[in-house]
Amino acid sequence: MSLAGLEIGGVRVDACQRCDGRFVTSETMRSILEHDGVIAELRAVLPRAANPWAEGGRVYVKCPVCETLMNRRQYAQGSQVVIDWCKHHGIWFDAGELPRVLDFVAAGGLLRWALT
């Protein structure tokens, strides 16, 4: 997997040039979620293309850091986005998933589910 690092909103997001997926470390994701301005900037620049591999069924992705198969799970209750997650290194977002998660967060999705 060939990843290119992109600096967007002061955070590093790694992008796969083949499938347009994104890898975000756990630390970077926490930083994104703590700053509304970063969320807004990422939402403005990230492509919202659909995942070209979605019709192929469930595909397990290897972590680009440790090459262990990542776990699939819903990002957060109510998000309707299934991510690939390495508990040691971060989150893999298929093409279009990171903007969908950021839309969910910007709409108060994390707060809404935390209060219920």
Can you name each region flagged by the protein language model?
Residues 1-17:
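The feature marks the first
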Residues 21-38, 90-107:
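Short metal-binding segments enriched for Cys and/or His
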Residues 34-58, 110-116:
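Intrinsic disorder/low-complexity detector
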Residues 3-8, 26-29, 71-76, 94-97:
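Short Cys/His-rich "knuckle" micro-motifs
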Residues 16-19, 63-66, 86:
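Short cysteine-rich clusters marking metal-coordination/redox-active sites
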Residues 1-3, 40-51, 67-72:
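Short Cys/His-rich Zn2+-coordinating modules
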Residues 5-10, 49-62, 75-80:
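Short, flexible, mixed-charge glycine/proline-rich loop motifs
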Residues 1-2, 19-22, 68-69, 89-92:
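Cys/His-rich metal-chelating microdomains
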